[in-house]
Amino acid sequence: MNFIDVAKIYEKIEATTGRLEMIDYLKNLFLSTPPEILDKIVYLTLGNIAASFEGIELGVGEKLFLRALSLATGIPQERLEEEYPKLGDIGKLAEWAVSKKAAQSFFTEDLTVERVFDTLSKVARATGEGAQDLKVRLIAGILSDAKPLEARYIARIVTEKLRLGVRDMTVLDALSEAFLKGRAYRDKLERKYNIYPDIGKIAKVVAEKGIKGLDEITITLGIPVRPMLAQRLRSAEEIMEKIGPRIFAEFKYDGERMQIHVWKDGKVKIFSRRLEDITEPYPDVREYVSKAVEGHEVVLDCETVAINPDTGEILPFQELMHRRRKYGVEEAMKTYPTVTYAFDLLYLDGRELLDEQLDDRRKILKEILKENEKARLVQYEEIDGNVEELERFFEHAVEMGTEGLVVKDPKSIYQAGVRGWSWIKLKRSYISKMIEPVDLVVVGAFWGKGKRAGTYGALLMAAYSPEEDVFKTVCKMGSGFTDEELARMPKLLEDYKIDHKHPSVISNIEADVYFVPVKVAQVLGDEITLSPTHTCGWNKVRKNAGLAIRFPRFMGWRDDKGPQDATTEEEIIEMYKEQLKVVEVEETKSEEEA
């Protein structure tokens, strides 16, 4: 398959502002692709060469790419560096340079998808002495045979700036349309993706075998399962009404969510909430968890916390992040020792447990987990309908240095990749009006004026709707930034910049600049109000109105979270409703006092 055919589809996707149109282009691309290379097409379309959890990066900066482009086209690197700011996009620069060279070239070989993919794989795996020169030669080799449009997308993929805005869920929609009779099996496809998030492999399976191929996809050691997530409510009483009377109430530790895979021979892999392989920084966790489940093959869902080595107290999450380093691991282990609390069991000795009730998963976990000083079962209470008992346990959890509780339905199954009402967070800050920050995605920006001239004055922020796989605006945020953060912001967001509103963004507000929804920020506001302009919760609380966060303030970037981990539209709606209840109670008290 020639890469030019793929590049033409990419050009159409890049130009569209409609999500359904994007899905249709992808469907046609997938149907025209030989099944044996569909995985490669999918990876390239997502700007990767492998599943994201494999952590394979091309490692090509702009300077290195310009060397390769100069070698391929004969245009001096200095000239390319002069033209780059004028065009403002590495892809457009490569397209321009190759078009200049094409006018003088008569002998080129058609580029195939296989050649592009295999070359980029070699680039990613080039390490050691001479690796940079090898990468330059490899990239120059495919650019030499590239047509101008092909060069545009090769440049963007290589420098990790593809910006098509296609995400895994968009690919699943297109695969469903192409190979699974439209929407009929879309839910099953997503369930399989949630337990085996290698979307290239899944694409190849459904293209070759259709719906029957999905039955072959199971939990596999070394492949992370997308974690189940919790909703939130403000009070013990509401939680009991929602999932009671019988509940499990677990400590919610201020640590890092870890999915730990253990083989019978003691091999261990650790994945973060975002499915990143974080095995290397945690040799202590590997050792004490493997001992605790010795003789078994397991996939555990856990929370790991940093401990004060002198007092044994739980340290804040930010302290644990000092463990995320490539160097000085031994020293970090001594300064920030850890304890891991296991709270769920997804797989045991070849058997998937996702469809077992939490009751049964917990019993099995207690049977196989040989607790030690560092690997422990989560602290929890089984409570049967007693709200006061739940409130007392909540206060106890807070006194013990935790964030609060996660309350769970003992009859619930493990819904991988789903934020459902079977798990509900009860945290200290939910007891008050919007003291709890939310995590929102940057989808646009507005140029600053006066002191902020030359940088962004405010960001357009959005919540995520997993049901629709779109981002809906909830505020314009211009407060809370330091001068240094403001100065750095255009460069920080440059890689995500696009020239039109992204198809997965629902917005009534026109921004000066638009972004692919990737970057997540923590935001704190005064309250949530009805809005005639913002689209979050549109028509769901009141007709012709959405919801907005009033006086939003920037609290920091959440680099540990992806866009799909952001606060959801439903959570914003629930926070608004709970806020109304608090206001009503306060007004009633005031009237009684009067």
Curated annotation (Swiss-Prot):
It is an enzyme of class 6 (ligase). PROSITE patterns: DNA_LIGASE_A1 (PS00697), DNA_LIGASE_A2 (PS00333), DNA_LIGASE_A3 (PS50160). GO terms for biological process: cell division; DNA biosynthetic process; DNA recombination; DNA repair; lagging strand elongation. Keywords: ATP-binding, Cell cycle, Cell division, DNA damage, DNA recombination, DNA repair, DNA replication, Ligase, Magnesium, Metal-binding, Nucleotide-binding. ATP binds at residues 250, 257, 273, 303, 343, 419, 425. Its EC number is 6.5.1.1. It catalyses: ATP + (deoxyribonucleotide)n-3'-hydroxyl + 5'-phospho-(deoxyribonucleotide)m = (deoxyribonucleotide)n+m + AMP + diphosphate. The active site is at 252 (n6-amp-lysine intermediate). GO terms for molecular function: ATP binding; DNA binding; DNA ligase (ATP) activity; metal ion binding. Belongs to the ATP-dependent DNA ligase family. This is DNA ligase 2. It comes from Korarchaeum cryptofilum (strain OPF8). The gene is lig2.
